[in-house]
Amino acid sequence: MNGNFQIRKVAVLGAGVMGAQIAAHLVNANVETLLFELPAKEGDPNGNVNKALDGLKKLDPSPIASPARITFIQPANYDQHLEKLRECDLIIEAIAERMDWKSDLYRKVAPFVNEHAIFASNTSGLSINQLAQAFPENLRHRFCGIHFFNPPRYMHLVELIPCTSTEAPLLDQLETFLVSTLGKGVVRAKDTPNFVANRIGVFSMLATKHHAQAFDLGFDTVDALTGRYLGRPKSATFRTLDIVGLDVFAHVVNTMRENLTDDPWHKHFELPGWFGYLVDQGSLGQKTKRGIYQKIGKDIHVLDLHTKQYRLSDAHVDDGVKDILRERDWAKKLAGLRNNPHPQAQFLWAVFRDVFHYCALQLEHIANNARDLDLAVRWGFGWDNGPFEIWQAAGWQQVAGWIAADIAAGKAMANTPLPAWVTEPSRTGVHTQQGSYFPRPLAGERADVGWISDSASTKIHDPALNGGCATLIHPTPLGSYQPRSQLPVYRRQLFPDHLLGEERLYGETVFETSEVRQWHMGDGIAILSFKTKMHTISNQVLDGILRAVDEAEAHFTALILWQSEPPFSAGANLLQLMQGVQEPAQDSGLFGKLKQAANRVKYTVAGGGGLGDVLNAATGNVPHVEAVVAKFQQVSQRLKYAQVPTIAAVDGLALGGGCEFSIHCTRIVATLESYIGLVEVGVGVLPAGGGCKEMAQRAAQEAQRFANDNRIDVFPFLRRYFQNIAMGEVSKSAELAREMGYLRQSDRIVLNRFELLHIAREEAKALSATAYRPPLHQRQIAVAGSTGIATLKAAMINMLEGSFISEHDYQIGCRIAETMCGGDVEAGSLVDEQWLLDLERRNFMELLATEKTRARVEYMLKNGKPLRN
């Protein structure tokens, strides 16, 4: 295969749930995509595909980054458009999990597959080698499995499975495409039933089901125990089954039962009678609105196995068990569970024990190393830590001893002893800085990935491995450690997804405080990372950014704001800000004095009075709060006008102040899954860190481009920015953030978050190489003025009268309108940035003086969600 092989066009065969969503994610990544389905029996031959595309629009969360993207999926059918397959570099089959149906389709399309194309099946567990037999022999070297997890846009994992004929370079090309273009985490799996993630994840669910029945625990109690307390999705176990679909889960378990007859746990690959009863009834979970759970009105009901009726969910976790689960140290957590006699604790230990036992026995059969198994479970099932990571963190030898003791006592689900490599006296785990463990085959046998020598290191060759080969290092008597993939695409991941046992060395420190750290990697680019929870912005963070800009200007060529984990920033530290307001209020009634001061002193920006003049009548920390707001604005402006380019590397939430800092940077580099917005209305204030000013300025710039006879009408361009801020809208993707105006056309969208820092650095280098100069300060910004304010108020009055917004929402909206329209001036008036910043600050402080804003802030701090009062 040519080294410059490019995947330019992709065909997806099958417009079912998975096929349509895979096609959607391909166009999310700007890949030209054809979606095939059987022709409709009546009307438009593409009717079946078009129906599937309509269905995409109804899914929540949305599989498409922007509604406009769906128009880029090209409908096709097997009767009219097979010739179009010749143009495709990658063909993904995603029809139903029937070997006979897939084989028939392969024979039908094979004559139209071009000689350079890759053909891949999205099967979730059927044998890739058996599927390959239906393909012409001369094409089998370009055939493999490519298992996306549902939903494809959001689930990071893709399993890549070769057949015996698959060319190693083909897999390398495909992995590169999946990782960098589609943003996926790829695990090379062996051709065993259900591959890696489903094999372990489904077994974990079966073990949970088994022990829940043994300890007589309700479904809702099990979910309360096996969700966030264990670092797993909130949907936990049985709620996850409802989301997946009980029929789908039954199919996966059936695959294990039929194809894993020699598995020591085979007797447990059965579903209980109640499960079959629900499936036969058509109670399949979320898609049928009833399964193990059922929502009745606003209440969640759960199936009670004792009565066979649904009851109100009322899960209760024992206080003692809850204390154990809150323990962060896995060694203490597992010991606490094993030693606590409460059924809930014994249930959890039993599940951990049997999952560890299963992973240890199956590792060499299903995966190429322990790292692949752990990452597959993390990326495919949403666990914070993989099974081996947890075992290693809890103390390898201690846990191995517990498992062995329980096996000997007949407590485990299978009586097969642990493999010998597990109990090597020197073993402390499976993950090291040098690599992750790979079990050695028995003497005289050939492993699926080749022979392992007893020398210091050896290369093994097999297409199942990344790059077709790997160097195994530090062999033990029973195995070796395999380093991470050496494929060039992974050089773009400066800090790949971290495993316990691996070090993370974040460059050389420039300066560090309790809340920020500035560092560099020796390339002349400074990086600033926050250390606060959710990367919120405190007064100390503001000071840190100002210092970081100074350091960057003095010693570096660029500054990047980047966090090692999402989110980018959840915004201002409300608790710190409000403590600054409220501390002296115990005796002085500060909020009342703020309100009195605002009512007594009438002022405008035009009058030249600073906000401090207004608040002189108020005591306590009001000047401090105003100073913090002014510092927010100073930081935003400093980022915008720094003498070196500033890059916001955004991943996840960028809300409030986090959004404001981003939009002021020279460039934003954002992952597709970035959720950006100015949400201050939720706590009863307006964006005052330059957000209102910046969006008003962007509206003026857009209006300037469409000016007629030197008359600039800002309002048509301002309206959408006002609505975004007044409604607290948050983008559901970086693509939508661009449509909302938070990202500019020059900003970049990245599909793989582990490449974010690499691309941000490349942007910084490119900007610096152009002899970067910051923009000139804007001194003539056209505003919508009093006419714009009146128009926006009229629209809000209609919403108020229609009960779409509250009275306080209206008051907040009026303040936002005044700020963004430039105050009480004529439409088309020209103002400078400081004028708009002063308006921001004034209106923020006046809103902060109101009782209803105070209630919103306090409610948010207490409940973590907005109050609409």
How should each PLM-predicted stretch be described?
Residues 1-462, 473-557, 563-566, 575-631, ...:
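N-terminal glycine-rich phosphate-binding loop for ADP-containing cofactors
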Residues 659:
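Short glycine/serine-rich donor-binding loops of glycosyltransferases
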Residues 465-466:
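Short linear segments in intrinsically disordered or otherwise low-structure-confidence regions
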